[in-house]
Amino acid sequence: MIKKLSLISLFTLLPASFYFAQTTVYAYVKDQEGKPVESAEIDLVQSTDDVKADKIGYFQFVDLQPGQYQINVSKPNFETKVIEFTVSANEKRRDLGVISLLPAPFANAGVMVIDDAASDSDEDGSSMQPTIGLLNSGRDIFQSVTAFELGAYWFRPRGVDNRYEDVIFNGVSMSKNDDGRVDFSNWGGLNDVTRYPYESVDNITPSAYTFGNLGGVVYYNTRASSYRKQTSLAYSFTNRSYRHRAMATYSSGLSKNGWAFTLSASRRWAEEGVIDGTQQNSYAYFGAIEKQFSSRHAINLTAFGAPTYRASNAPNTQEVYDLMGKNYNSYWGWQDGEKRNSRIRKTFEPIFMLTDYLKLGKTSNWTNTFSYQFGSDSRSRLDWFHGTDPNPTYYRKLPSYFFSKALELESDGGNDVTADELAEIEAVRNSWQTDSNVSQINWDALYRANYLNKTGMNGEKRGAIYTMVEDVNEDKTFNYSSHFDTMLQPNWKLNLNFNYQNLKSDNFRRVSDLLGADFAYNLNAFGGDNPYNVDDTNVEVREGDRTQYNYLLYRSSYAFNASTELDLPKWNVMGSIFSSYSESQRDGKYRHHYYLNTSKGKSGIYDALDGGVKGRVTYKIDGRNFIVYNGAFFSVAPTLNEIFVNPRVNERMTPGVSNQIINSNDLGYIHRGQVLKIRLSGYYTTISNSTDISRYYLEGGGDDNSAIGAPNAFIAEVLSGADKRYMGVELGLDVKVTPTLNANLVASVGDYEYTNNPKAYSYSDVDRTYFAADQEFGEANIKGLKVAGTPQKAFSLGLKYNSTKFWWLGVSANYLMDQYLDFSVINRTANFYTNPRTGDIYTATTGEYTGFDIPEANAENVAALLKQQKFDDQFMLNANAGKSFLIGKYRMGVSVSVNNILNNRDYVTGGFEQGRKSNFAASYEDNLNAEKGGYALFAPKLWYDRGTTFFANVYLRF
């Protein structure tokens, strides 16, 4: 009797919800033809209870408590559908019926194009990098719009550089060891197999597969059986960096004996892109083969690569654009009736991955991947030895130079420029616009110069004046990654990740074309004709030989990451920690004549220890409303390019280089309704102790006579210990006006700036007189200057009509604000306003060249000269449309997207100050040249938007 009473007492203490009938909710997922959508993912919002549809499209959730729920039903190539439902007390089973998924218009259209040509420039091109925001397009309205609409105009969410983003294939990071950036060209053109990531998290949200960085994680699982069984053919026509794209993809699905195959190939090509002289011929291939030994064990072999040949385009000063138009490109010239570009990027870095999938018990999985990547990345350019600069935009060849010379002749205070001088200037301008031998590279003249120089006065053989060379990077990277996950409890998940990577990077310059000469000299024309390698007595080099620099870089790293997620009725909590260790070393193969003791052989080892923590806390107000906090505090080890400041010539490590410290927080509100969806968030991020290095070629050198015999000096401007702050708010609204019409509004208001005055240095691989070795300039006065490379404010208003007849039409109005010019580091130091002859601040004087009055270099006058340029705000109009068809068992679709419909050519997508006039007097005189009616000789170099661009696509799937 006592036992019975005890049991009765125990049951009376149980919560009332225990007595409610726990409910099973089920449904069927089908496509527009009524066929089951196998493996559709059903996400029970803010819960770890996610399931997949089986072979007949069926899924169910069991033991749901009474309450309001929301599920997201998704599958690659289909639009995600959101379903809301209520579970009532005493309801044993709830039938949601048939959930129909429609083909995703953008998935079929292929209109999202990552222009990997943006990373080709070596003219301070770091501010012109694509971001993984372009890959992160399907999660919510804010990310979709910033990818498709604003991303086309180089908008970066939260101002985050590509350096702080992660793209992962099967546990292997695609970030390059030299600069930390993702090189999208390694898989460019493989849209069919990389369209849908396995995991995609934005910003600092913790990931299950890696700790990540500041700018989010995109994770791809290339398991062959994960791709939908089908054959896909597609052709695209566009006027962007290429004209044509053809793709073919085949996925076998999983056979009865456990085999699965996925193959994909593509080609992108153009005789000439929208920018003059930019031809392209790029291929890509992908193969994945999987063998399932049982339901618990499988292996998968993946291989992909993208052999790419692509011509680059140059940034120009405003004078050049005004002369020749926005599509002008100085890198090409006519040769034998064809356009030949001097700046060609050729890449082919295939990667092979072997992945083992093992299921342990009922709730644990262990995945291991071994990978090996190798290949070459080369970028060509013209080089010269005791010759004049062949670049048509060299400042002495421009009308502004002749205008400045005319001003010099009028230093007596009379008329600025005479009529005869104006006529001469006009003749120069006219020759630019009518004679391609003036406005473009004159290849015939280069061949002729080499031919006439083959033999000296005494009959001796002489080497080339002009050559084509390639800067080559050949990496060999081995990687091992391991991922383990387990459910500790039904609502508690644990992830463990380990990664080891080993890199050997071979870097050198190679002679690619002697331009008719018999050989070239491995001599420094700007260094007394001393050999670049004093240990080699043979200074003659021929096509295919290495020249000027030759060194290896080594890096090995180990990383461990653990993350956990706990789901509670009103809360969802996720935390992640990591630690990593890396070693980096340089091994020089040439003994440079300037650095006899520090150029050849192995350097010391630079080691770095990293660590950090991330967290996310979600409070579930109810089934539709959530408050989400993300926080992160971690360090980032410097890249190889940040460690070795001038590796072409010596082993010198960047002064003060050490780990960056990142502290980032954001707080957001999310509403997910049937009619209205809202995402509102605010963020605050600091990056401390960063090393920022701008590398570029300085045309000519340091003085007015250096055009003769001076190859382009390779300059490194260094900011050591820079602090930056990023803060702002983001808003995304999606309103279902009618069942077929959606309206969306996206706003991003940011403020990104430098918050301290770091140390500045400058290095050159050629000229020790103008840029002395290890030259320190003291503090750079950059506090308060804006971070360049992205509009800091952006707005988009869009409408999209989805017809029940399987066609759609979308339009968006976009407004971009607060885009800034990248600044010259040296111009922000005391060197700028200090007279090198006296060591004092410049006093009021008469111009050395023009004879005009130059004021004192006081704070007001210096600030006026160095004010950071802010570009004008711009409006862009985009549209897209498409339709899909069913023809028997075949699915066909056509689509077209048009960006910048109004052909706005005033939008500056990026630019940088030149560092040639790095003192107050010279800079003031240069600006006077513009004020008197000409142009500044060393004005900023800019990139402009390409105007109206389109992308048309047709596909066939069966």
Where are these regions (language model features)?
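Periplasmic N-terminal accessory/gating domains of Gram-negative outer-membrane beta-barrel systems
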Residues: 85-206, 268
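Acidic/polar loop-and-plug regions of large Gram-negative outer-membrane beta-barrel proteins
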Residues: 290, 298-355, 378-469, 528-542, ...
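Surface-exposed extracellular loop regions of Gram-negative outer-membrane beta-barrel proteins
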Residues: 311, 315-320, 540, 583-594, ...
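Gram-negative outer-membrane beta-barrel transporters
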Residues: 570, 684, 713-826, 953-957
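C-terminal beta-signal and adjacent terminal beta-strands/loops
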Residues: 687-689, 815-849, 853-857, 883-958
